[in-house]
């Protein structure tokens, strides 16, 4: 895959005078929750409403998402607010259901990016799609894996591509939930300067007080947008141990 100015076309088509903003809850929990958040966001700079329908968890027994019923809530968000919609997909069935419910943007999560098998399955299911497809960096700082995921999607004739930087896992003590390791997305940006690059400060920070700092750094580095988790009331989200997140 070579850099191509056409890679930016889908982003340019938004005709924005500010960075692209994708926002919404980490997880879809109820229809009322989704609609409340979407209605708060619709008058802002947010262009795309995000919500996790299926949630990959480290251990069984944790909340793994509401499942396909949440796709109907995304449809309602789109119909009533005019916002485009986005969700994470991790297999071919997720892709099929998301497309059936007219989700506009599909992203591949960091835990999926680490597996060429998973990325290829998703790429095959998306072959030739006109949906916007975003791929997060792998959880470990392996730029080759990220390149490989991008190339697999591009080889499946997916034209509306972008990447999301969400930081990297580390055993070292850090103020960040996932270390940004800015040199890695910068290297990707140097290789593909026209591939839209979005920062996910929520996953990098893991706490609200760092969001502005990380968001500003990404924009100073010429990132094209932000993906931010947004909640109306943190005390009511399904993961009370992570109420410091936004």
Where are the predicted features?
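Hydrophobic faces of well-ordered beta-strands that scaffold small-molecule active sites
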Residues: 20-24, 47-51, 85-87, 106-108, ...
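Catalytic alpha/beta core domains of metabolic enzymes, predominantly
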Residues: 118-233
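Short, acidic/polar
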Residues: 31-40, 90-96, 210-215
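N-terminal amphipathic alpha-helix/helix-capping segment at the start of soluble metabolic enzymes
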Residues: 1-22
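Alpha-helix-loop-beta-strand connector modules within alpha/beta enzyme cores
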Residues: 64-86, 125-132, 184-194, 242
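Single conserved hydrophobic/aromatic residue that forms the stacking wall/gate
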Residues: 235-246
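Active-site mouth loops of central-metabolism enzymes
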Residues: 20-34, 60-62, 85-88, 110, ...
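N-terminal active-site wall of soluble small-molecule enzyme domains
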Residues: 51, 55-107, 116-118
């Amino acid at each position: 895959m070579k850099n191509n100015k056409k890679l930016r076309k889908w982003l340019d088509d938004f005709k924005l005078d500010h960075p692209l903003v994708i926002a919404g809850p980490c997880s879809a929990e109820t229809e009322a929750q989704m609609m409340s958040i979407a209605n708060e966001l619709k008058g802002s700079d947010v262009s795309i409403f995000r919500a996790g329908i299926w949630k990959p968890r480290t251990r069984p027994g944790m909340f793994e998402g509401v499942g396909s019923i949440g796709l109907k809530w995304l449809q309602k968000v789109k119909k009533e607010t005019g916002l485009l919609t986005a969700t994470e997909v991790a297999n071919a069935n997720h892709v099929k259901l998301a497309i059936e419910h007219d989700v506009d943007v599909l992203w591949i999560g960091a835990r999926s990016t680490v597996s060429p098998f998973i990325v290829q399955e998703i790429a095959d299911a998306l072959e030739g799609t006109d949906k916007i497809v975003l791929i997060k960096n792998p959880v470990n700082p392996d730029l080759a894996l990220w390149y490989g995921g991008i190339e697999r999607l591009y080889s499946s004739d997916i034209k509306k591509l972008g990447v999301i930087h969400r930081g990297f896992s580390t055993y070292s003590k850090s103020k960040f939930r996932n270390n940004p390791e800015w040199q890695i997305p910068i290297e990707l940006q140097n290789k593909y300067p026209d591939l839209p690059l979005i920062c996910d400060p929520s996953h990098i920070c893991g706490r609200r007080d760092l969001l502005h700092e990380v968001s500003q750094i990404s924009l100073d580095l010429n990132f094209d947008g932000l993906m931010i988790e947004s909640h109306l009331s943190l005390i009511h989200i399904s993961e009370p141990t992570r109420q410091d997140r936004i």
